[in-house]
Design a protein with these regions (language model features):
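Bacterial Sec-exported substrate-binding components of ABC uptake systems
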Residues: 2-46
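Short, flexible loop segments at the rims of nucleotide/cofactor-binding pockets, characterized by
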Residues: 20, 36-38, 79-85, 101-103
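Extracytoplasmic substrate-binding proteins
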Residues: 30, 112-135
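Structural recognition of the beta-strand scaffold that forms the well-ordered cores
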Residues: 41-42, 58-62, 103-106, 124-125
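A short, structured surface patch at a secondary-structure boundary
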Residues: 45-94
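Short coil/turn segments
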Residues: 62-65, 106-109, 128-133
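Proline-aspartate-enriched helix->loop->beta-strand connector
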Residues: 92-94, 99-104, 122
Length: 135
């Protein structure tokens, strides 16, 4: 699963770095990114891992208010980030304050705040929680 997420992020960044706009399909449907995201907030630790693997550093992470929840080797690779609360209950105020241009959320865990997140920035909904490695 993590390999697929890394592949997806790498492909997404490759496509939008060479084009003016890119249409992205996720678990909720499709949306268009007008430019390459520079200020990304992730609401799952696996998404932070995947971004770090392709040298993309999120500005905000739902790290459960504990930086040690992120794997040490990933934490060493990331610049200081702003905690945006817990994965189960991310802080919409903290996310909005960071002025992200993309939020990456879990399609199951964050379904209840999806509309509120969309008011802040485009939201990429991916599967992370309750997934197996085969998926």
């Amino acid at each position: 699963m993590l390999a697929f997420i890394r592949f997806l992020f790498a492909g997404l960044l490759l496509v939008i770095s060479h084009a003016f706009a890119a249409t992205v399909q996720d678990e909720h449907g499709t949306f268009t990114l007008e430019k390459t995201p520079q200020r990304i907030v992730v609401l799952e630790l696996s998404f932070a891992d995947a971004l770090a693997a392709v040298d993309v550093i999120p500005i905000g992470i739902a790290d459960d208010n504990d930086a040690k929840r992120i794997l040490p080797e990933v934490r060493a690779h990331l610049k200081p980030w702003q905690s945006v609360g817990t994965r189960a209950q991310p802080s919409l105020e903290a996310i909005a304050a960071l002025k992200p241009d993309l939020i990456i959320a879990d399609s199951s865990r964050h379904a209840g705040v999806y509309i509120a997140l969309q008011q802040i920035a485009p939201v990429l909904l991916l599967k992370s929680r309750n997934e197996t490695y085969a998926e």
